[in-house]
Amino acid sequence: MNLETIIGLEVHVELKTNSKIFSASPTEFGAEPNTQTSVIDLGYPGVLPTLNKEAVNFAMKAAMALNCEIATETKFDRKNYFYPDNPKAYQISQFDKPIGENGWIEIEVDGKKKRIGITRLHLEEDAGKSTHAADGSLVDYNRQGMPLIEIVSEPDMRTPEEAYAYLEKLKSIIQYTGVSDCKMEEGSLRCDANISLRPVGQEKFGTKAELKNLNSFTYVQKGLEHEQVRQEKELLSGGIIQQETRRYDEATKKTILMRIKEGSDDYRYFPEPDLVELYIDDEWKEEIRASIPELPDARKARYVEEVGLPAYDAHVLTLTKEMSDFFEATVADGADAKLTSNWLMGEVLAYLNKQQKELKDVALTPAGLAKMVQLIEKGTISSKIAKKVFNELIEKGGDPEEIVKAKGLVQISDEGTLRKVVTEILDNNEQSIEDFKNGKDRAIGFLVGQIMKATKGQANPPLVNKILLEEINKR
């Protein structure tokens, strides 16, 4: 029996509003526990929620960027459940009238493009955060009432790789809109994955398992890969899959049962009595649509068609808005687009990955990188010397021209000076000259290396090659 994998994802994104969704409590990350909450967040008797319009605007903006249809009438509902991090014993969410429906995004895996449907996008409030220790549990209600959007995909993904690509694309789009920073390490983006298997050709879905507590896109992919294998073994051996919630354990590389999965009936949804229905007219929708910036796909196409970058460069540069904006600012300061792209995709990304930092955390500026690239273009410094300048720029900042002068890094481009060095090197390496004349091309590399060593790497490489061949041919 051949089995087909069916994957759907539920992604929670914390909106970057100044206050919570139903109260005026602040939303700053990292504050002391239980210092950013109020009687409204905690559901004290007699208090009433007030809807934050900015949260609605952000939800609409995200929904439009994801090609969703925006509701004209939408409402909030109570999702009833008891848990220590939910002080009201219910969560205000949206059940049957979400703010956005029927959206899609396009992903690419192994060179093949595929459209993934988005069932719905709805607004809701976040719960608090529980921390468990050996001698008890602690609850921080700072997160209680934070505005969230939940984005539910169609079960259109067939491999864990497609799920990973979907998450990357979704995160990129949301970041470009500016409604969230989507930092998984801070909990502003969280993902639950649903996976089931069915015989190839069968229309009815198999019984699904839900994977929770997936704190990185890599864990989502690994968890799905393991669950795919687990369910396949179970089904092929004649067993059955139970509807349950599981978590991925990185230490054992397995998914572990958490609980039997609840159905939506278990939550006893009913309309939120303290909030009226929300009507969204065409004028409001158009106001939000006009505020949507250039999104990653459009920017990528522009980089290829107008800027002239290779498709791969355009893809890498537009993965994050931070990198793309940095590229644009550097080119706007007069740097060559392709040279800038090479430095960003090479040295800059390598440094950021090694140091586990973002561009905003380093001293490098678009103006600084632009000046350095221009020095390379003018021949003032070589690409090799530029790496020394770059290390200074990204660690401490400064003016590239001043760094070059202070460290004596100006490239030697005087032909007379270089010819003298070349002649001296050749006089001391006659065997290498013979080797080169006998067809051993590696000999020229050795000679160039000796010249670069003698000039402390500051010789102009193209000029060195030209003079070297001229002097060899004279002998």
Curated annotation (Swiss-Prot):
Pfam families, sorted = GatB_N, GatB_Yqey
What is known about what this protein does? Answer: Allows the formation of correctly charged Asn-tRNA(Asn) or Gln-tRNA(Gln) through the transamidation of misacylated Asp-tRNA(Asn) or Glu-tRNA(Gln) in organisms which lack either or both of asparaginyl-tRNA or glutaminyl-tRNA synthetases. The reaction takes place in the presence of glutamine and ATP through an activated phospho-Asp-tRNA(Asn) or phospho-Glu-tRNA(Gln).
Q: Which reaction does it catalyse?
A: L-glutamyl-tRNA(Gln) + L-glutamine + ATP + H2O = L-glutaminyl-tRNA(Gln) + L-glutamate + ADP + phosphate + H(+); L-aspartyl-tRNA(Asn) + L-glutamine + ATP + H2O = L-asparaginyl-tRNA(Asn) + L-glutamate + ADP + phosphate + 2 H(+)
Q: What class of enzyme is it?
A: ligase
Tell me one GO biological process term: glutaminyl-tRNAGln biosynthesis via transamidation
Which keywords fit this entry according to its UniProt record?
ATP-binding, Ligase, Nucleotide-binding, Protein biosynthesis
EC number in record: 6.3.5.-
Q: What is this protein called?
A: Aspartyl/glutamyl-tRNA(Asn/Gln) amidotransferase subunit B
Q: Does the keyword Lipid biosynthesis feature in the UniProt annotation?
A: no
As for family, the record states: Belongs to the GatB/GatE family. GatB subfamily.
**Which SMART domains does its entry note?**
GatB_Yqey (SM00845)
Subunit-structure text: Heterotrimer of A, B and C subunits.
Q: Which InterPro entries match?
A: Asn/Gln-tRNA_amidoTrfase_suB/E, Asn/Gln-tRNA_Trfase_suB/E_cat, Asn/Gln_amidotransferase, Asn/Gln_tRNA_amidoTrase-B-like, GatB, GatB_C_1, GatB_Yqey_C_2, Gln-tRNA_amidoTrfase_suB_CS
Q: Name one GO molecular function term.
A: asparaginyl-tRNA synthase (glutamine-hydrolyzing) activity
